[in-house]
Amino acid sequence: MARTARIERKTLESDVLVELDLDGTGISSSDTGVPFFDHMLSQLGKHGGFDLTVRTRGDLHIDAHHTVEDTSIAFGSALREALGDKAGIRRFGDATVPLDEALAQAAVDLSGRPYCVHVEPDLVGMIGTYDTTLTRHIFESITASARLALHVRVLSGRNAHHVVEAQFKAVARALRDAVALDARVAGIPSTKGVL
């Protein structure tokens, strides 16, 4: 059974298309109009081992908030849909990823219960047209729409680009492990029988 999803999200603020294949090869293509965010989405695809296509048109004449938020919601929805009933998955994943001086840790539980803990240092306000305060909101939006628990911590780092990118890579690697199929898991990986 293919673990894929195609999500279209249209609001008065944005028009989003996300296509996701959990069992891909890390091929990604993103065009949101926010170049640094596109770079981060590419990290999710590449290091998550997902094939990911994202096309967003948003109200960038205001700022990047709605574009980034709606894209993140659509990505989380695609992740939830592609997972289906979650039978046979590992469910949990964690990763610690360095990027030069930056070190980020992420842990995920595909529990069906959304909860996000995000700890990072104060960063310079902008990376190009990307507002660094959106990083937490991206992870919160993915968490809520995918219905997963996510913990992200920055353990060290000075360069804002490195700090944010290390977080996305860590989340990608944690998701890669959590969505992986495990032949030893029969059915739903929960004593409740549902996730």
UniProtKB/Swiss-Prot annotation:
The answer to whether UniProt assigns keyword Transcription to this entry is no
Q: Which InterPro entries match?
A: IGPD_sf (IPR038494), ImidazoleglycerolP_deHydtase (IPR000807), ImidazoleglycerP_deHydtase_CS (IPR020565), Ribosomal_Su5_D2-typ_SF (IPR020568)
Subcellular location(s): the record lists:
Cytoplasm
Which EC number(s) are documented for this chain?
4.2.1.19
Its name, as the record gives it, is Imidazoleglycerol-phosphate dehydratase
Which PROSITE patterns does this UniProt record tie to the protein? IGP_DEHYDRATASE_2
User: Which taxonomic lineage does the organism of this UniProt entry have?
Assistant: Bacteria, Bacillati, Actinomycetota, Actinomycetes, Frankiales
Q: Which UniProt keywords apply?
A: Amino-acid biosynthesis, Cytoplasm, Histidine biosynthesis, Lyase
Q: In which pathway does it act?
A: Amino-acid biosynthesis; L-histidine biosynthesis; L-histidine from 5-phospho-alpha-D-ribose 1-diphosphate: step 6/9
Q: Which PANTHER family match?
A: IMIDAZOLEGLYCEROL-PHOSPHATE DEHYDRATASE, IMIDAZOLEGLYCEROL-PHOSPHATE DEHYDRATASE HIS7
UniProt organism field: Frankia casuarinae (strain DSM 45818 / CECT 9043 / HFP020203 / CcI3)
GO CC terms: cytoplasm
The question of whether Amino-acid biosynthesis is a record keyword is answered with: yes
Family the UniProt entry places it in: Belongs to the imidazoleglycerol-phosphate dehydratase family.
According to its UniProt record, this protein's enzyme class is lyase
Gene Ontology biological process terms from the UniProt entry: L-histidine biosynthetic process
Q: Which NCBIfam families match?
A: PRK00951.1-6, PRK00951.2-1, PRK00951.2-4
What this protein catalyses is: D-erythro-1-(imidazol-4-yl)glycerol 3-phosphate = 3-(imidazol-4-yl)-2-oxopropyl phosphate + H2O
For molecular function, the Gene Ontology terms on record are: imidazoleglycerol-phosphate dehydratase activity
